Amino acid sequence: MAVGKNKRLTKGGKKGAKKKIVDPFSKKDWYDVKAPAMFNIRNLGKTLVTRTQGTKIASDGLKGRVFEVSLADLQNDEVAFRKFKLITEDVQGKNCLTNFHGMDLTRDKMCSMVKKWQTMIEAHVDVKTTDGYLLRLFCVGFTKKRNNQIRKTSYAQHQQVRQIRKKMMEIMTREVQTNDLKEVVNKLIPDSIGKDIEKACQSIYPLHDVYVRKVKMLKKPKFELGKLMELHGEGGGAGKPAGDETGAKVERADGYEPPVQESV
């Protein structure tokens, strides 16, 4: 066996040398996430995306990004069992403009409502809004004791359950079909649809804890920047002329344009 040093290791080549550690955050930028004008608190927070490099544009990585936010954070409220999903539809400068993408109840709220000695009634329906959004709404309700009832249980008969389910579907269809997405979201925030169902079903069987527990977005119309700007109210309206011009420029080159302006 030949005695001597291994030339490959002593040169400081592949095996001996350490790789240079590059901080991944040095190539990323922070963008503000803006909620539509239906909500009291418009600034949701920030999101990270890799900077524009060559053909890979930063705004393309942000479009379609979904944020799940508690209604308590959107309305500055203490009731925090409703969660809204907001999807990024356009990027204006350093702002991500979002739109409604769905709603859900928290797991702990759903579990707290399901109890013994009562009937749980569920219904779901697919409805189209006036502006072309196809939504699937899920509703849930629970029977409760009548006034002066001595019996421990409050079970509804199968026929009553069917009547209540029919009523739920009718009210959900009516409330969504006659309104656009903005008005539907305004009804989901205080859950006025659930309260209407509770009132309408009193004559069939008394109900409590009636909620639209989930809303799914099934289909959307073709994206229009003007409509998204309307949803974002004052911010969108004020920046509308500039928004149409700068929106396209920012998408093409995030880090290239400012230095050119300075030199001019």
From Swiss-Prot:
It is found in: Cytoplasm; Nucleus; Nucleus, Nucleolus. One of its GO terms (molecular function) is structural constituent of ribosome. Its main location: cytoplasm. It holds the Pfam family Ribosomal_S3Ae. GO terms for cellular component: cytosolic small ribosomal subunit; nucleolus; small-subunit processome. It comes from the Eukaryota. Component of the small ribosomal subunit. Mature ribosomes consist of a small (40S) and a large (60S) subunit. The 40S subunit contains about 33 different proteins and 1 molecule of RNA (18S). The 60S subunit contains about 49 different proteins and 3 molecules of RNA (28S, 5.8S and 5S). Part of the small subunit (SSU) processome, composed of more than 70 proteins and the RNA chaperone small nucleolar RNA (snoRNA) U3. This is Small ribosomal subunit protein eS1. It comes from Xenopus tropicalis. The lineage of its organism: Eukaryota, Metazoa, Chordata, Craniata, Vertebrata.
